[in-house]
UniProtKB/Swiss-Prot annotation:
Quaternary structure and partners: Homodimer.
Gene Ontology MF term list: ATP binding; heptose 7-phosphate kinase activity; heptose-1-phosphate adenylyltransferase activity; phosphotransferase activity, alcohol group as acceptor
Pfam family, one: CTP_transf_like
Biological process annotations from GO: ADP-L-glycero-beta-D-manno-heptose biosynthetic process; lipopolysaccharide core region biosynthetic process
Region Ribokinase: start-end pairs: 1-318
Organism (species): Pasteurella multocida (strain Pm70)
Function of the molecule: Catalyzes the ADP transfer from ATP to D-glycero-beta-D-manno-heptose 1-phosphate, yielding ADP-D-glycero-beta-D-manno-heptose.
Protein name stated in the entry: Bifunctional protein HldE
Cited NCBIfam families: cyt_tran_rel, PRK11316.1, rfaE_dom_I, rfaE_dom_II
Superkingdom of the organism of origin: Bacteria
Keyword Cytoplasm (UniProt): no
Cellular component, GO, one term: cytosol
Lineage: Bacteria, Pseudomonadati, Pseudomonadota, Gammaproteobacteria, Pasteurellales
Length: 476
């Protein structure tokens, strides 16, 4: 019987692989350079994210599970930046720093939601033989319940056979999301997780379920695997093991917005489940549910234990949704006890538009949980005039509750949410527009409690007033 729980009390996971730092520069583009026929981007914001094996570790940490990350980096600023980023998510890093190579970094320049350019700073590690990395792996294995080898083809796993042997000697399951068509190099692993196209590139075209099973079992025998999980997009996933019936799970995705990083989520939850003592079937079930959540988000994302628990039990993936102040304080206390970072913002959100959506997505990325405090109808009327709000409080909150970026919604009836913020005390208070941080309601209370305050830019040209004006023009 499956343990329908997203709590992994015994799990500890070790990750080794190609670690990367993803950097994003965002800016406005209004003219062409006089020097060359290229756009000029005025950089206004930037963001850093963990990539490659580091993203796998981030996925595991999001499940409130202890995780250690091993890999190769340069002795450079980007390597330090990556370690700092991971430390914020309570990920223990033990990197081998090389003076001969830079930390793999990908810099993307974006404007108006379009990627204009990507710059790669890397020299792969294919010719690097790192005994130090093997020694770190050997000494760490005994303290963990599963090993993930994250292969992005950059060379960190060029001694993958020795790594697999070390794990087998320690009786630790080894899970690998394979790269390329040479699956022989993964001989002896516990589990591979190829997607359908990767699987068919190795075994040939499969025209039926029976052929998938037949060729999958043959591959397991050929390279001495314990199991094979083929992820099949909208067709779900299929687990194959010797002398066991095929175990198929239909997709859990309701809507698919972006499959970026879904493979990392699958192998992260699989490894966590196995490290927690779950069966292959249980771990695959949880991984399938997690994949259904993450493909409904934009960009590389992680899945929290609350989201996973909610999906298992048929609740909304937006967390606990609309709630009273008392309920909010209770769940915030629980989230803080789990070490989650709480972000809070507020507004009228009268007619939801792309500027709102973009702003809330950016706010959510700054922490683990996003609270949106919404002005009551009377509060909006006092601030905006007798003709507002256009939509009543219930309607405004119902629409906001449908956004994947929003975890918790609460109403407030005063002109500002200062009292509410002082009682909730988020880790980060966010406001959009041209405010000075010290002028934002609740900022002093948040600072006094050790939190921070941040101002985010709104998307140019997007406002409720502009929407209302356009509607009035059409009417006239």
């Amino acid at each position: 019987m499956f343990q329908y729980s997203a709590e992994f009390k015994q799990a500890k996971v070790l990750v080794l692989g190609d670690v990367m730092l993803d950097r994003y520069w965002f800016g406005a583009t209004n003219r062409i350079s006089p020097e060359a026929p290229v756009p000029v981007v005025r950089v206004q914001d930037n963001e850093e994210r963990a990539g490659g094996a580091a993203n796998v570790a981030m996925n595991i940490a999001a499940l409130n599970v202890p995780v250690k990350l091993l890999g190769l980096t340069g002795r450079d600023e980007t390597g330090l930046a990556l370690e700092s980023l991971l430390a914020k998510s309570r990920i223990e890093c033990d990197f081998v720093q090389l003076h001969t190579h830079p930390t793999i970094t990908k810099l993307r320049i974006l404007s108006r939601h379009q990627q204009l350019l990507r710059l790669d700073f890397e020299e792969d590690f294919q010719n690097v033989t790192s005994d130090a990395l093997l020694q770190k792996l050997d000494s760490a294995l005994q303290n963990y319940g599963a090993l993930v080898l994250s292969d992005y083809g950059k060379g960190t796993l060029n001694q993958v056979q020795k790594m697999i042997q070390l794990a087998r000697q320690a009786n630790i399951p080894v899970l690998i999301d394979p790269k390329g068509t040479d699956f022989e190099r993964y001989r002896g692993a516990t589990l591979l997780t190829p997607n359908m196209s990767e699987f068919e590139a190795v075994v040939g075209k499969c025209d039926s379920e029976e052929e998938i099973i037949e060729k999958g079992l043959k591959l397991i025998e050929q390279i001495d695997l314990s199991a094979l999980l083929v992820t099949r997009s909208e067709k779900g996933m299929t687990l194959l093991r010797p002398n066991q019936p095929a175990f198929h799970l239909a997709t859990e995705a309701k809507e698919v917005f972006d499959v970026t990083g879904a493979g990392d989520t699958v192998i992260s939850v699989l490894a966590t489940g196995l490290a927690d003592g779950r069966s292959f079937e249980e771990a695959c079930y949880l991984a399938n549910v997690a994949a259904g959540i993450v493909v409904g988000k934009l960009g590389t994302s992680t899945v929290s234990t609350v989201e996973l628990e909610n999906a298992i039990h048929g609740r909304s993936n937006t967390g606990f949704g609309i709630m009273s102040e008392a309920e909010l304080k209770r769940v915030v206390a629980q989230a803080k006890a789990r070490g989650e970072k709480i972000v809070m913002t507020n507004g009228c959100f009268d007619i939801l538009h792309p500027g709102h959506v973009s702003y809330l997505e950016n706010a959510r990325k700054l922490g683990d949980r996003l609270i949106v405090a919404v002005n009551s109808d009377d509060s909006v009327k006092r601030l905006k005039g007798e003709t507002r709000p256009i939509n009543d409080l219930q309607s405004r909150m119902a629409v906001l509750a449908g956004l994947s970026s929003v975890d918790w919604l609460v109403a407030f009836h005063e002109d500002t949410p200062q009292r509410l913020i002082a009682e909730v005390l988020p880790d980060l208070l966010v406001k959009g527009g041209d405010y000075k941080p010290e002028d934002i309601a609740g900022s002093q209370e948040v600072w006094a409690s050790g939190g921070d305050v941040k101002v985010l830019n709104f998307e140019n040209g997007c406002s409720t007033s502009n929407v209302i004006s356009k509607i009035q023009q059409l009417k006239d």
